[in-house]
């Protein structure tokens, strides 16, 4: 079981549709730490850390569109090394 952290930027209709809240719920269900945050360009930034297989499941869920009310057009991911210790999965403003 290896731990990884990723940062993802999710583009499409992802703000104002409950995207951060459902991402938080899914990440908590998978046992991940991190956060979801609305960005000024209309995207959502997601940082997720935990077991590599569980992080992959979250990425797959994000690529599949997240909540039904959202529409994901594009997702970019890369490895990430947070400068802070992340506990739980939060929504940032």
From Swiss-Prot:
It holds the Pfam family Acylphosphatase. It comes from the Bacteria. It is an enzyme of class 3 (hydrolase). The active site is at 20, 38. GO terms for molecular function: acylphosphatase activity. Its EC number is 3.6.1.7. InterPro entries: Acylphosphatase, Acylphosphatase-like_dom, Acylphosphatase-like_dom_sf, Acylphosphatase_bac, Acylphosphatase_CS. It catalyses: an acyl phosphate + H2O = a carboxylate + phosphate + H(+). Residues 5-93 form the Acylphosphatase-like domain. Keywords: Disulfide bond, Hydrolase. The keyword GTP-binding does not apply. Disulfide bonds join 5-49. HAMAP family: Acylphosphatase_entero. Belongs to the acylphosphatase family. This is Acylphosphatase. It comes from Salmonella typhimurium (strain LT2 / SGSC1412 / ATCC 700720).
């Amino acid at each position: 079981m290896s731990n990884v952290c990723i940062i993802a930027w999710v583009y499409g209709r992802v703000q104002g549709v409950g995207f951060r809240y459902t991402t938080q719920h899914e990440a908590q269900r998978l046992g991940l730490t991190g956060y979801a945050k609305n960005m000024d360009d209309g995207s959502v930034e997601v940082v997720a850390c935990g077991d590599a297989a569980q992080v992959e499941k979250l990425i797959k869920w994000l690529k599949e569109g997240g909540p039904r009310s959202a529409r994901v057009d594009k997702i970019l991911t890369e490895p990430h090394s947070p400068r802070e210790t992340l506990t739980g999965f939060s929504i940032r403003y």
